[in-house]
């Protein structure tokens, strides 16, 4: 699929973590700094913190070690413990663009006793126009959403171990 086809383009990943749905949601949304790949930063200084403001319309941004904030997007839907829908407003130049958005939907569903399935769908990548295939390849790369979710799984595993 390419941008010219007009079809929706997305990247989809799923993982299962040894936490309840509520704990998995809270861990993902409140401790993103701990699993976000540090090299995935758009700020001038080193990444210090990733913040998801816990409400519809909240900001999604990074704070650098210099204290400066760089907005990534906003929270379009806040539905704990089931779903968070984040608007990714970073263009092909890796800068925040308030006029541009793709969607990162993360859902949390029970997956057995004290386990949660986490589905991440980064959709509407066709909005990158003639750079759609390039951007999809970046998000689809092992260093993209796969790496981010691997960090989340590691954090969830450590959290589950500390609970027992």
List the model feature ranges, each with a label.
Residues 8-16, 59, 70, 83, ...:
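Intrinsic-disorder/low-complexity, polar/charged segments enriched in Ser/Thr/Lys/Arg/Asp/Glu/Gln
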Residues 13-15, 50, 72-77, 101-110:
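Hydrophobic/aromatic beta-strand elements that line small-molecule binding cavities or substrate pockets
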Residues 24-28, 60, 75, 86, ...:
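Hydrophobic pocket/interface hotspot
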Residues 46-91:
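Glycine-rich portal/gate segments that line the openings of hydrophobic small-molecule binding cavities
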């Amino acid at each position: 699929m390419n941008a010219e086809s007009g079809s929706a383009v997305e990247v989809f990943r799923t993982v299962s973590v040894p936490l309840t749905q509520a704990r998995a949601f809270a861990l993902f949304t409140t401790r993103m700094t701990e699993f976000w790949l540090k090299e995935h930063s758009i700020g001038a200084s080193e990444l210090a913190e990733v913040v998801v403001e816990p409400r519809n319309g909240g900001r999604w941004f990074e704070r650098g070690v210099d204290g400066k904030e760089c907005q990534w997007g906003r929270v379009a839907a806040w539905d704990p413990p089931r779903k968070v829908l984040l608007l990714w407003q970073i263009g092909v130049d890796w800068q925040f663009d308030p006029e541009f958005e793709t969607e990162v939907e993360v859902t949390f569903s029970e997956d057995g006793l004290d386990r949660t399935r986490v589905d991440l769908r980064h959709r509407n990548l066709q909005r990158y126009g003639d750079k759609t295939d390039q951007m999809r390849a970046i998000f689809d790369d092992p260093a993209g959403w796969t790496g981010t979710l691997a960090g989340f799984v590691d954090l969830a595993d450590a959290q589950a171990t500390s609970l027992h």
